[in-house]
UniProtKB/Swiss-Prot annotation:
Motif (Gly-cisPro motif, important for rejection of L-amino acids): 138-139
Lineage per the UniProt record: Bacteria, Pseudomonadati, Chlorobiota, Chlorobiia, Chlorobiales
Enzyme class per UniProt: hydrolase
Protein name (record): D-aminoacyl-tRNA deacylase
CC terms in the record's Gene Ontology section: cytoplasm
Family assignment from sequence similarity: Belongs to the DTD family.
């Protein structure tokens, strides 16, 4: 699993006729699923995202998590995180899990993050063309890959 975590002052996602989903201060998490991902990878990533200490404490040091500050999370699926541009100029996406595998795993990841946060977590619409807007704070942007399991 691969995620891009962005510390935000606000973020939103919209798609077609759907009402936009908005969050205040917290994390925008773009999430990609690989074919080999499993419950262990989801659990590891869930704990990592929720407990990342990337918010400032009273001394101005990154020492608080999104949960610590009572922040919000917006999860957005993004299979393009597994793009391959090593050959030619058009990206290939064979490194991403297919819809039938990835959708239930993304839904499980969403459920796990909600349980870890102990409150609702916003999300976009899996497999839909979306418009994502954010006000990045810092900016703080991290790319995180789950450990390879064998």
């Amino acid at each position: 699993m691969r995620v891009i975590v962005q510390r935000v002052l606000s973020a939103s996602v919209a798609s077609g006729d759907e009402s936009a989903v908005h969050i205040g201060p917290g994390l925008l998490v773009l999430s990609g699923i690989a074919p080999a991902d499993d419950q262990a990878a989801l659990g590891w990533m869930c704990r990592k995202v929720v407990n990342l200490r990337i918010f400032d404490d009273e001394a101005g040091r990154m020492n608080r998590s999104v949960k610590d500050i009572g922040g919000e999370i917006l999860l957005v699926s993004q299979f393009t995180l597994y793009s391959d541009v090593s050959s030619g100029n058009r990206p290939g996406f064979s490194g991403a899990a297919g819809y039938d595998i990835a959708k239930p795993l993304f839904e499980k990841f969403h459920q796990m993050v909600q349980q870890e946060m102990e409150r609702p977590v916003a999300t976009g619409w899996y497999g839909e063309h979306m418009q994502v807007a954010l006000v990045n704070d810092g900016p703080v942007t991290l790319i995180i890959d789950s450990p390879t399991r064998s």
